[in-house]
């Protein structure tokens, strides 16, 4: 439901302790698919474009409050926060939320911060069903093959909801009902306010139950109805780590399927993990063991993996990234990366460039067509176009106190095992010999070499390491050399 609905508000309940998670992190802050549980719920709420969104927080509010504010910033809209000082039941939580909805008289949807699979479409269908006919409360329900543990929905002959009966209180006939309560509701705001003021805590838990609103509404002659969700999986709550993993797997299945239907080939969906904010172009090939995290963007016709993890990366059209771990960086069009490449934040590889095996980069800008083929560290550096960095080279950027910058020009060729002692600049078209330690700037077109002439000390092994295998091998080799005299 994308159009603005000025007559709706959404309340997200996220005040519980979530003790079954056995975590120092508040339950709704655990993540699947690159978002926290409460972020998923707030995104679903925002998809309705309601007048107000209210998050009710309590336990761990020092953690949850800033997280809600971050999501609101990401959504570009206000999310009001209500504090439930004492966790005294779902009815009390909604009472706390109503302070943020003073004067609002439309439809209030109440959902939970631990149902990450619930979509805006399903909330929209609930809202549409609720407003189609005058209704006090509409319960979002689901049909389950095994309803054990859930509150059963009891309807009358007209299809109205007469009761929600909990498992422990249900008769055998009621236990056979497969339609159950999801814990998500749509309320008429005026009726909800009145009913909330009448809630009592005369129950085994001594709490105020939101479900008691239904009985109050019916006792006053207001209709209570149910709307069955099309996909019960959306309403699966997360209460422990097992359910967190199950929800994550289901969300990933959806995300991977959407990518394939959008034109990407995913060789093995079972070993491919894609966060919900990842974007993937057409004719992309994703090989097994690939993880695409955060806001990663994959251009058309790129190939990713196998065994690759990319977080907040931008991959250009036609690029190939194989057996690579990369984050917060950009790979240009038709560039090649891997295998066994480590791309740290701030790397920008130009179009048609190459980062090869066992190369590590950090805060490095590498120009179009330039290559770093193997066994090299490039940190705090700028490399121009069409340059080649020899194997086993190191950009020595740290002097023990500061990180320093190296600048390599275009069309530069450096020999293997070159050390660049930053800060240093190598001009366009320059070369370096193998094993060179570059401490001073190299002018354009110059050849940089360091070190003296090679010196061989004859017979050193036999004198210093007599009796060793090396000495014996040397002696045998020397004795086999033909005598050139006479």
Swiss-Prot record:
Record localization: Cytoplasm
One Gene Ontology CC term in the entry: membrane
Linker: annotated span: 242-262
Pathway noted in the entry: Nucleotide-sugar biosynthesis; UDP-N-acetyl-alpha-D-glucosamine biosynthesis; N-acetyl-alpha-D-glucosamine 1-phosphate from alpha-D-glucosamine 6-phosphate (route II): step 2/2; Nucleotide-sugar biosynthesis; UDP-N-acetyl-alpha-D-glucosamine biosynthesis; UDP-N-acetyl-alpha-D-glucosamine from N-acetyl-alpha-D-glucosamine 1-phosphate: step 1/1; Bacterial outer membrane biogenesis; LPS lipid A biosynthesis
Keyword list, A-Z: Acyltransferase, Cell shape, Cell wall biogenesis/degradation, Cytoplasm, Magnesium, Metal-binding, Multifunctional enzyme, Nucleotidyltransferase, Peptidoglycan synthesis, Repeat, Transferase
SUPFAM superfamilies: Nucleotide-diphospho-sugar transferases, Trimeric LpxA-like enzymes
Domain of life of the source: Bacteria
Region described as Pyrophosphorylase: 1-241
Any one biological process term the GO annotation gives: cell wall organization
Major place of residence: cytoplasm
Reaction catalyzed: alpha-D-glucosamine 1-phosphate + acetyl-CoA = N-acetyl-alpha-D-glucosamine 1-phosphate + CoA + H(+); N-acetyl-alpha-D-glucosamine 1-phosphate + UTP + H(+) = UDP-N-acetyl-alpha-D-glucosamine + diphosphate
Record region (N-acetyltransferase): 263-486
Molecular function as annotated in GO: glucosamine-1-phosphate N-acetyltransferase activity; magnesium ion binding; UDP-N-acetylglucosamine diphosphorylase activity
InterPro entries the record matches: Bifunctional_GlmU, GlmU-like, GlmU_C_LbH, Hexapep, MobA-like_NTP_Trfase, Nucleotide-diphossugar_trans, Trimer_LpxA-like_sf
Pfam families xref list: Hexapep, NTP_transf_3
Sequence positions that bind UDP-N-acetyl-alpha-D-glucosamine: 13-16, 27, 84, 89-90, 151, 166, 181, 239, 344, 362, 377, 388
Family, as annotated: In the N-terminal section; belongs to the N-acetylglucosamine-1-phosphate uridyltransferase family.
NCBIfam families associated with the record: glmU (TIGR01173), PRK14352.1 (NF010932)
Physiological role: Catalyzes the last two sequential reactions in the de novo biosynthetic pathway for UDP-N-acetylglucosamine (UDP-GlcNAc). The C-terminal domain catalyzes the transfer of acetyl group from acetyl coenzyme A to glucosamine-1-phosphate (GlcN-1-P) to produce N-acetylglucosamine-1-phosphate (GlcNAc-1-P), which is converted into UDP-GlcNAc by the transfer of uridine 5-monophosphate (from uridine 5-triphosphate), a reaction catalyzed by the N-terminal domain.
Name of the protein in question: Bifunctional protein GlmU
């Amino acid at each position: 439901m994308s159009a603005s609905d000025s007559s709706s508000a959404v309340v997200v309940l996220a005040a519980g302790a979530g003790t079954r998670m056995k975590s120092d992190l508040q339950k709704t802050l655990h993540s699947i698919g690159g978002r926290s549980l409460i972020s998923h719920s707030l995104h679903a709420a925002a998809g309705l474009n309601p007048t107000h969104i209210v998050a009710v927080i309590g336990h761990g509010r020092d953690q949850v409050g800033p997280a809600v504010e971050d999501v609101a910033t990401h959504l570009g809209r206000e999310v009001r926060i209500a504090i439930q000082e004492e966790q005294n039941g779902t009815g009390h939580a909604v009472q706390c939320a109503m302070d943020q909805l003073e004067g609002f008289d439309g439809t209030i949807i109440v959902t939970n911060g631990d149902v990450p699979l619930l979509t805006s479409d399903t909330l929209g269908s609930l809202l549409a069903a609720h407003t189609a006919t005058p209704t006090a409360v509409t319960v979002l329900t689901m049909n389950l093959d095994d309803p054990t543990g859930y509150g059963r929905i009891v309807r009358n002959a007209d299809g109205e909801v007469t009761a929600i009966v909990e498992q422990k209180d249900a008769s055998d006939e009621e236990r056979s009902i497969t339609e159950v309560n999801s814990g998500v509701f749509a309320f008429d705001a005026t009726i909800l306010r009145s009913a909330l003021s009448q809630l009592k805590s005369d129950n085994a838990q001594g709490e105020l139950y939101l479900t008691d609103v239904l009985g109050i509404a019916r006792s006053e002659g207001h209709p209570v109805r149910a709307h069955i969700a099309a996909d019960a999986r959306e309403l699966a709550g997360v209460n422990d780590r097992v359910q967190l993993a199950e929800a994550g797997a289901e969300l990933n299945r959806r995300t991977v399927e959407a990518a394939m239907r959008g034109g990407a080939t995913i060789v093995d969906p079972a070993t491919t993990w894609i966060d919900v904010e990842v974007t993937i172009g057409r004719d992309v090939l994703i090989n097994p063991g690939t993880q695409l995290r955060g806001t990663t963007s994959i251009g058309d016709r790129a190939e990713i993996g196998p065994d690759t993890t990319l977080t907040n990366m931008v991959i250009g059209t036609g690029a190939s990234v194989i057996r690579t771990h990369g984050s917060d960086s950009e790979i240009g069009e038709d560039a090649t990366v891997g295998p066994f490449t480590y791309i740290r934040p701030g790397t920008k590889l130009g179009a048609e460039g190459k980062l090869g095996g066992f190369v590590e980069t950090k805060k490095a800008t590498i120009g179009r067509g330039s290559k770093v083929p193997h066994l090299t560290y490039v940190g705090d550096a700028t490399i121009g176009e069409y340059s080649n960095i020899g194997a086993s080279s190191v950009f020595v950027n740290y002097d023990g106190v500061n990180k320093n910058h190296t600048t390599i020009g275009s069309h530069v060729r450096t020999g293997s095992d070159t050390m660049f002692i930053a800060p240093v600049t190598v001009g366009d078209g320059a070369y370096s010999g193998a094993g060179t330690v570059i401490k001073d700037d190299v002018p354009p077109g110059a050849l940089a070499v360091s070190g003296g002439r090679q010196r061989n000390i004859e017979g050193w092994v036999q004198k210093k390491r007599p009796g060793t295998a090396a000495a014996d091998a040397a002696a045998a080799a020397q004795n086999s050399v033909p005598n050139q005299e006479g």
